[in-house]
Amino acid sequence: MKKLIILIFLVPFFGLSQQLFWYDVFFEVEGGNSNSVSKLVNDFYSTVDKPSDLSIAFSRIPLKGENFKSTHMLSMFSPSSMSLANFRNSLKGEKWDLYTSGMRGKINSIRAVAGNVLSHVNLDKVGPIGQAWIFKVHAKDNVKFIAAFSKLMKTFKPNGFVAAGQLTHGSSDGESMVIYATASNLNEAFAGGGPKNKKEADAMQTFFEEIDFAEFSQTFTRVQIMNY
C-alpha cells in the first residue's frame, strides 16, 4: 500500500533563484473538523514571527489517489535553507504547545516531508491550484531527470508555474522526484495544460523517452486556503 505524502509548494515571488527549499506537513483531518483545523492553523500562523524570505501556505487536497489519505497540507518554503531551518526550529513555546494540543483529536495522522526545487519556469504565474506528479527515480539518475525537464521547458510553454524537484527527507516507497504545475482556476486545471502544437508534443515525447528510467507513482492536487 502506497503511503505517498509529498511536498506541494505554493511558491511565492522570490525572484529568479532556481532553487527553493520546502518543509511540508500533511494532515488527515477527521470528518467535520475541517473548519476547526483551519481556524487553529490561521490563528497560529497568522501571528507567528517568520523571516521575510519565507512563506507559509495552507491548502486542502481534494483530488488524489485512493491510498492518499491526507486531506490538508501546510507548506513552508524559502530560497534559503537557513531561513527555513531557523523558522522550523523556532516553533516551540507556549503558543506552539496550545496550537499542537488543539490539533490533537481533530486529525487522524500527520506526516512531514522536505525537499527542494531544482528547476522552474514562470515564477510570476503561480496559481492557487497545483498538481504534483510523483516519480520513483534512483539517486544516480536525479541529475538526468532534472536535465530532461530543463530541456523540455525550453520548448514547452506552460500557462502557469511549473517546477521539478527532489524529496530529500521523509519520502517513502522509493518516491524521489516531483513535477509540479499550477493553474489559475479550476477550468485551467481540468484542461490539463498539455502540448499546444506539434513542436511541444514532440518535446514532450522526447522528455518521456529521456526519463524512461523513472517510474510514475501518483498524482494529487491541492487548492490553497490561506497564505502567510
What are these regions (language model features)?
Residues 1-2, 197:
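Generic cytosolic/nucleocytoplasmic N-terminal low-complexity/intrinsically disordered segments
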Residues 3-16:
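Sec-dependent N-terminal signal peptides
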Residues 17-228:
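Short S/T/G/P-rich N-terminal loop/turn motif that feeds into the first structured element of a domain
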